[in-house]
Amino acid sequence: MDFNYDDTQKKHAAMIAQVCAEQLAACGNEHSRYFTARQWAICGEAGLLGLSIPREYGGQGLGALSTAIAMHAFGLGCTDMGLVFAAAAHQFACAMPIVEFATAETKRDVLPKLASGEFIGSNAITEPEAGSDSSNLKSRAWPQADGSYRLDGHKSFAGNAPIADIFVTYATTQPEYGALGVSGFIVHRSSAGLRVSEPLDKVCLRSCPAGEVFFDDCRVPEVNRLGEEGQGRQVFQSSMGWERACLFAAFLGMMERQLEQTIEHARTRRQFGKPIGDNQAVSHRIAQMKLRLESARLLLFRACWGMDQGDPGQLNIALSKLAISEGALASSIDAVRIFGGRGCLESFGIEAMLRDSIGTTIFSGTSDMQHEIIARELKL
């Protein structure tokens, strides 16, 4: 078993580190409160918006493991996790369903624009009364005589929605089949009957604007359906595999950056005539941070390796997602405690990691739902 990166993976990681240090860090962005078009353009130029999109459509054509390694480098080098999240949601929850389930014509039309960043993608599945229970959708899509669909519904917490050009969304087409009667669709921002709210104020990932999406007699051409009618559950689960693995690789990078900062602080901050790291209470917290990081890394790479072998096992992906989510939150709390009052100041960046890590336990499937998936896969 070889734990080393290959030459291509090393090259991508080094390139991303350079882009983060030389270009993204210079953007400032007022403590990462707002989305900026300049940062998005930099990501597009660097290929960060199409890591897993095939080369024939302008992407990098990376497999799951290489994509995760690249996203780890992105989260390690970029202090604006909202931007990282926006880029990840764009390609894993929006572009990848199009890669895997759209028609050849739609792929040729949409994917190059997503890979370059000309189009911004959003995934809209969550509803006011359908969060974790994503199969209980109230949104409906009715087939029309001309082959199109009439879409009505209300989506909430859609990442990138206020700035998106393309939406991947889901609606019930055959209610008598329950979860097997859901279909996936691509909806363009210019579609009549589509309306998006102003950005929602939230505690975490602020530079990735989230909003509500309303479909009111919105017409969607049949060519914009993803896969067959009733295949929406498969489309969504596939996209969640990519998102739970490769998006969360970025938060593994954040955990590593956080650990490096905390170790440096513990070595240089002196109290009672010695570095605070000499105190067992501090050093043991840092040891736990390291344990969480390395355990999560192994689970992540195992899950991504399986995806590349054609085995997107839900068990390994859920284990990885849960380890990173809970590990990031626990380590962020430890980091704030070690930094003390400075950990509560925006200028040190530690409080932002704590806020952003709260979100990791909720989006892309809550930690409670990951426990449920793990228990189900163990036949409990």
Swiss-Prot record:
UniProt entry keywords in alphabetical sequence: FAD, Flavoprotein, Oxidoreductase
E.C. number: 1.3.8.14
InterPro entries referenced in this protein's UniProt entry, alphabetically: Acyl-CoA_Oxase/DH_mid-dom (IPR006091), Acyl-CoA_Oxase/DH_mid-dom_sf (IPR046373), AcylCo_DH-like_C (IPR036250), AcylCo_DH/oxidase_C (IPR009075), AcylCoA_DH/ox_N (IPR013786), AcylCoA_DH/ox_N_sf (IPR037069), AcylCoA_DH/oxidase_NM_dom_sf (IPR009100)
Enzyme class: oxidoreductase
Transmembrane segments: none
Catalytic reactions on record: L-prolyl-[peptidyl-carrier protein] + 2 oxidized [electron-transfer flavoprotein] + H(+) = (1H-pyrrole-2-carbonyl)-[peptidyl-carrier protein] + 2 reduced [electron-transfer flavoprotein]
GO molecular function: acyl-CoA dehydrogenase activity; flavin adenine dinucleotide binding
Entry keyword NAD: no
Binding sites annotated in the UniProt record for FAD: 269, 280
Obligatory cofactor(s): FAD
Residues of the active site: 243
Function summary: Involved in the biosynthesis of pyoluteorin. Catalyzes the desaturation of the L-prolyl-[PltL] to yield 1H-pyrrole-2-carbonyl-[PltL].
Protein family: Belongs to the acyl-CoA dehydrogenase family.
Name recorded for this polypeptide: L-prolyl-[peptidyl-carrier protein] dehydrogenase
Organism: Pseudomonas fluorescens (strain ATCC BAA-477 / NRRL B-23932 / Pf-5)
Organismal lineage: Bacteria, Pseudomonadati, Pseudomonadota, Gammaproteobacteria, Pseudomonadales
Gene: pltE
